[in-house]
Amino acid sequence: MNQFMNSDIRRVKAGLRQSIKQMRSELDPEIKKCMDDSITDTFLRSTSYTRSDVVLTYVSTGIEVSTERIILTALRDGKRVACPRCVDGSREMEFYYIDSLDELKPRTFGVREPEADPGRLYDCTGHPICIVPGLSFDRWGYRLGYGKGYYDRFLSRYGGWTVGLCYSACVQYKLPHGRFDRPVDRLITEKYLRLCDEIRPGRGGVKRK
């Protein structure tokens, strides 16, 4: 029974990924920039950001909510910024601290990544906020990723706060998810900031002190 359910979930997710990628690729560049700016402004004003001293963030591609201004602002604000790098030969990733966008170079899937410098590996200290990429999120904070599992594996070990950035047109009422999927705590679109961890049935997120 579970095998059939998992198969159905994978099939539904695959269809959603295709349609949402298409939707995002057709966004007018000027409209996209306006939405990116609005989402960025909301994030930078949020307590999730102001109370953090470490920002873990994806490096945006063309169809994603841009994170460049977030990275630049966090560095100017004196916060430590770390970006992900895929580990060769696996579906794991590690975060490395950066001091400039110039340190990021195209690598896995053409995404810009930091160098694998052991001295700059994210050390799980401080008060981090992790900005999680997603093609779609639902109102409870569950996400539709790209299907590779990199963030799923990282989030299973990560104990800090999480936020998803998404265009409101890509938000679903409810996404299919498994029992090991971890929802984000906050969801920000160009229209609203949703406190997913406070409204989610059963409060299914990570418990923190």
Report residues per predicted region.
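Surface-exposed, charge/polar-rich loops and edge strands
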Residues: 2-11, 22, 115, 125-130, ...
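N-terminal active-site beta-alpha-beta segment that forms phosphate/nucleotide-binding
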Residues: 2-125
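Residue-level signal for inorganic ion chemistry
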Residues: 20, 81, 131, 147, ...
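Receiver (REC) domain switch-region micro-motif
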Residues: 55, 130-131
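Glycine-rich, N-terminal phosphate-binding loop of Rossmann-like dinucleotide-binding domains
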Residues: 59, 134, 191
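Short glycine-rich anion-binding loops that position phosphate/pyrophosphate groups of nucleotides
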Residues: 61-63, 135-139
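Charged helix-capping and loop-helix junction motifs
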Residues: 72, 144-150
